[in-house]
Amino acid sequence: MSKDAGGGQMNSNLKTSLSECMEALDLFLSNNFQEALDQLRAKSKDSMYHALTYATMLEMQAMMTFDPQDILNAGNTMKEAQAVCQRYRRKSTVVDSFNSLVHKQSLDQFTEEEIHAEVCYAECLLQRAALTFLQDENMVSFIKGGIKVRNSYQTYKELHSLQQCANYAKGESHCHFEGGVKLGVGAFNLTISMLPTRILRLLEFVGFSGNKDYGLSQLQEGTTVHSFRALLCTLLLLCYHTFLRFVLGTGSGNIEEAEKLLEPYLKRYPKGAIFLFFAGRIEEIKGNIDEAISRFEECCESQQNWKQFHHMCYWQLMWCFTYKQHWKMAYFYADLLSKENSWSKATYMYMKAAYLSMFAEDDCKPFGDDEVQIFRLVPSLKLKIAGKSLPTEKFAIRKSRRYLAQKLVPLPVPPLEMMYIWNGYAVIGKHQDLTEAMLQTLVRAEKSLEGVTASEFLIDDRCVVKLLKGLCYKYLGRIPEAVESFSYIQLNEKRIKYDHYLVPNAMLELALLYLQLEKKEEALRLLENAKNNYKNYSMESRTHFRIQDALQQAKSLPQNGC
């Protein structure tokens, strides 16, 4: 349909579609999940916005469950949405591509619907790539999306350029288009800026570039535009500040910014499960553990239709009770997850056994469970998503294997070690009482290692405890003891037999401590050493993300003594 012949009708259809999708989004945020999906599904084969919104909601579900079937379903639905968007794109030859049109032909050859089709198509590609990364934390898998990622990136770049053109005429639904461009440009800039240097160089070689501050500003602007994408911009920023900065960073998210973003949504949707969850997470990383527990419990009570929200809360509640060293409650939530959620049975069972190992001798163990038997079960629960094992699961399986030996040597503090993998010490570090209590537990563990018979695991176990003690010392301001703890691991590097991840992570933690003390040169030496001289160790990708974050922090500091 040409612009002159039916532009008015197309604009009317576009406006109606956007209005209906906004209504469905409102239902979704009010916990009416199935009603929202049903409304969208009815038109998902014909309307690009219905198709995209429907697929986005299914992808959100997959991100909550990690269920292989949910992931497959979300991926297929997003692929179908992409095909719907393709039907609305401007028909052109390979040579006469969209990119060529922007630069070489008059912009008025695009109808408003065709412009929206471009941004929706790019968003489908971006979300499919995100789903790939969800399955494997290694950015190589993201890059393997290859043409999907590159086409999406290039399209967003061209659309962004289009907006800046003097002869670009804004359509009636321009705010939704603008929000889509800000979402894509912001997401790409932010994601690329976080990548470890080795991957960043590869991406830059093939034409990608990312600026963290620009990405954040684009997403921030996207939250203020009254558009279909404002929510997605908000959720992405909330995820960045409250999760990515911790799991794939050094734990320095902008919590004040997260609170500002969340406030209007909590006001409008006081029982909205998504927003109650983020409210709980914000309290958690502020160190207000009891308040966080209340919020997560409130989130579970707010709706019963999507158990996936409950599972996200159970995971956070498990950690909240870990921080408080309430082992029975932490076990309770790990047990619930092992029975109800499919993300990683191996990880959940590992955590169950880990908590049981912390029970006092006279504690009654639930259902007569025995941690040794559960640890032995963990390797058999290995799950592959899209042919890949989850990094956390690999870690749990490696740790559990020592329990398969006839003469077993127990792990010293398994839940506290896994807590480090998820950057939990950055959380309790804001709460002196919790940090002191954790340190005392580690001191007792260290003393117990002094009296054991020497084994092949002894040095590794001592170094694990030293790393965790060093973190507690750091957050308590006991700097010399923190330095001694991290340095102990480096001194014993050649004696470590299995836990090779300890050395680069000890260097990373010592470097972060030096950055705190404004010893930039010493910090940079450690970070470069950790980045360049160690490989093939547990949770390597996550460590490299954190090293990259630390290197970016170092750039903002003056030289030593300046």
Swiss-Prot record:
Keywords, in A-Z order: Repeat, TPR repeat
Domain of life: Eukaryota
InterPro entries found in the cross-reference section: Iml2/TPR_39, TPR-like_helical_dom_sf, TPR_rpt
TPR repeats: 273-306, 463-496, 504-537
A Pfam entry, by short name: Iml2-TPR_39
Family: Belongs to the TTC39 family.
Name of the protein: Tetratricopeptide repeat protein 39A
Native source species: Xenopus tropicalis
